[in-house]
């Protein structure tokens, strides 16, 4: 079922499903019971464009810290729970806007019911999360190994457990580090349930490998109309996850806003330190709320022509460069003034 037809779910003051905009999620890597550090990281992520934040709750200290954290942030908080149902209940009591559990590792039906009852009392959603690395032995054996079909079977089994307890305020996530398996699993599960799907490639890797795997996986899934929230899982600063997620959504035409920076790959004609210049421009435009394309080109010979599809651009030359707007050269400036002149044009932008 495509995102236009999924069930509408409220997470704090945000709404997903039913064709609502796809929201970006990340996860803190601080110790959750270190309230000051956790709040600082969440607020940085929110400023960068994070819509929903998830925090690990490995112990009761972390669960009890959630109320203090909640009072100092402005985006919904999801509590990530494994194994101990008491932590899930404590997280709910301390104000979590959603909890993430795998009913398969919470324990007996009575324990799952206790968690469901607590969520029902606060009317907060439960995210049912299944990972290819934690599939039940019998499902793996039945399918001859870890498969997309097995991931979906496990997820639906967990959903039915909670539905049978009288609750359907649910979000579902099915993840694998195998990109094509993850894509197939999402294609299959979207035909079986109407709950919103949180999409991500788990254990995708470091900045380079993680971005490539996530871009391919999320792109293939989202472009089919599947997925209601996303996370780009990276081994690194969570801020990088937000940058990547925003770019993926913008590239797919699923979100507007924010300046898109394009740059040439350099060649023997390059007459300027283009790599440094492109990075400086990307950092410089991060806080400018325009929905335009900025080109950074390496030479004044081909630069103006190649920058025609951008709204504005710069092209480097020997000790000087050009400012190009809508394909027309509007000024020539010294090399060391290119960034400041470009920023001035952006701050005074008019169509």
Enumerate the language-model features and the residues they cover.
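N-terminal amphipathic alpha-helix/helix-capping segment at the start of soluble metabolic enzymes
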Residues: 1-27, 120, 283
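Active-site mouth loops of central-metabolism enzymes
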Residues: 19-37, 56, 75-83, 139-152, ...
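Hydrophobic faces of well-ordered beta-strands that scaffold small-molecule active sites
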Residues: 22-28, 53-55, 77-81, 99-101, ...
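Glycine-rich, proline-tolerant flexible connector loops at the mouths of alpha/beta enzymes
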Residues: 29, 34-35, 46-69, 100-108, ...
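Alpha-helix-loop-beta-strand connector modules within alpha/beta enzyme cores
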Residues: 60-81, 114-126, 186-197, 281-283
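Glycine-enriched alpha-helix->loop->beta-strand junction motifs that scaffold or abut catalytic
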Residues: 73-75, 93-99, 120-123, 190-196, ...
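Hydrophobic or amphipathic alpha-helical targeting/insertion segments
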Residues: 86-127
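Catalytic alpha/beta core domains of metabolic enzymes, predominantly
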Residues: 131, 139-286
């Amino acid at each position: 079922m495509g995102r236009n037809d999924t069930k509408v779910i409220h997470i704090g003051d945000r709404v997903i499903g039913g064709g609502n905009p796809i929201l970006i999620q990340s996860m803190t890597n601080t110790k959750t019971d270190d309230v000051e550090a956790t709040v600082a990281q969440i607020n940085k992520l929110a400023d960068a464009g994070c819509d929903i934040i998830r925090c690990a709750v490995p112990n009761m200290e972390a669960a009890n810290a959630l109320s203090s954290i909640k009072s100092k942030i402005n985006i919904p908080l999801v509590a990530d729970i494994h194994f101990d149902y008491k932590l899930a209940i404590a997280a709910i009591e301390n104000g979590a806007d959603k909890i993430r559990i795998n009913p398969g590792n919470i324990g007996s039906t009575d324990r799952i019911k206790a968690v469901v009852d607590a969520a029902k009392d606060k009317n907060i959603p439960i995210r049912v999360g299944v990972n290819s690395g934690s599939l039940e032995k019998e499902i793996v054996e039945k399918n001859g190994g870890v498969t997309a079909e097995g991931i979906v079977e496990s997820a639906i089994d967990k959903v039915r457990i909670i539905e049978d307890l009288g609750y359907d305020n649910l979000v579902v996530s099915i993840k694998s580090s195998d990109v094509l398996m993850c894509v197939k699993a999402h294609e299959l599960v979207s035909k079986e349930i109407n709950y919103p799907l949180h999409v991500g490639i788990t254990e995708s890797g470091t900045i380079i490998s993680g971005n490539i795997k996530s871009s391919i996986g999320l792109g293939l899934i989202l472009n089919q109309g599947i997925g209601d929230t996303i996370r780009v899982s990276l081994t690194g600063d969570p801020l990088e996850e937000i940058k990547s997620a925003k770019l993926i959504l913008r590239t797919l035409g699923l979100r507007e806003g924010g300046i898109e920076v394009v740059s040439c790959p350099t060649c023997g004609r390059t007459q300027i330190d283009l790599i440094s210049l492109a990075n400086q421009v990307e950092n410089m435009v991060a806080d400018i709320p325009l929905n335009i394309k900025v080109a950074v080109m390496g030479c004044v010979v081909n630069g103006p022509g190649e920058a025609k599809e951008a709204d504005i651009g710069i092209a480097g030359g020997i000790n000087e460069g050009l400012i190009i707007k809508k394909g027309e050269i509007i000024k020539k400036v010294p090399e060391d003034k290119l960034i400041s002149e470009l920023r001035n044009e952006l701050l005074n932008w008019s169509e």
